[in-house]
């Protein structure tokens, strides 16, 4: 394996030790000391970014014949949902024009179909002497990932579309895009079919007639059956009859979660919850008493996203992700709704500041110590403390005193989602069965990660969120002037996410394509406007990569996203951009 990232020439390519043919050995250890990265005779796989592709291509061609190479392009539609110019567009166009490898695999869950890429295919065939085109489509319905709206109701086509023609268009669209079938809740399908069959005579859709044997009753086949069932039903009823039937089905539907909240007060505006200060600090909207639940003011329009308090138990099995364009607003909301007293926040702030000052003093003293003991290096006896001068011993004593002044930064468990104390605080008034509470997922942030984050020059809100088990993926916010510190923060958060130690990730839409971690639930904020169908499908695909038997949900705050997902595209911007950029002219 070799790697080409951010390369300006072939000399920037790096080989894994197993791929090295020429190298120097360490005379003491016998291991590889220095690799000749310019000799790639043993390289079988080159992993690169788009900007480095041409350099990587020429490198591989210098050791292999063109016909023996395969160019595998993962997610070639990244940035193609943007109509205006994007920095990647120039790279993509140059890559396509200068590419010399004819065996190309374009891999994406949202790749436009052949009919939409006629110009791209023609360009490819002209360049590579009538090259062959093969299309592979696959979809997996071995698990159900439930779509839920802002009112906590499961969403399926028959429950979403009151309009007869919209539902018919949706069914035809899903027949052509079966990957969306995994997001249709099996239980609701069965409820719908059973009810309709009691009202309408459809003998060909009786289970015994449709499924010839029990082996045919699979999740895939049931969902295909559902589409055919709707199509047949609509062909035998009028739009007015469907409208009445839809109304009845909506009335009969129950919420996905129906547990009662006895001590909740309601208000009208989120502005009464969040009162941001000009300096973007976190402030409490009101004082806290002994029973914070009874004093919590909640907004009915925000039901289902109180993820740091009363809705936390609904996040089960593993890490969840919340997509939003304003990550700081959602982060602030999570902190405020956790009801952390201002006194605790103030103490954490002071402890972080004191730790930072003491760590800087320790660094300075360590530097002085190293400078004064440089002549002792290699002399083990002299490096023992009792052989140091009084001045050096004084430095060591000062370092020890400062280390003892370092505070452990932590939160009480009642403020950490889904810990036992947190459940007792927020779930006591609900009739939630243990079978659900036992699977609610709690974060497990290790002390080393906490220390690293607290020592970084990042916004205080990010640090509090981390203590709660919540990470943030964003490089856009105004407060992020120190980019290197935030990049370090994100690497730590990514590592915690990969280890399933976080409870929740808050991310903006830039990270939809770049996240390959295992998520059990996702949220779409109301501010995700103008999302293309392809980007929605990519976002949905972040969830449900784990155990088949687990429960997965996707909770969408804006109904417009359901409409975009379920109906045929009026215009495919990604296909248009591919035809424009994947051109050798």
Give the label of every model feature segment.
Residues 180-182:
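A conserved mid-domain beta-alpha-beta active-site/ligand-binding segment of alpha/beta enzyme cores
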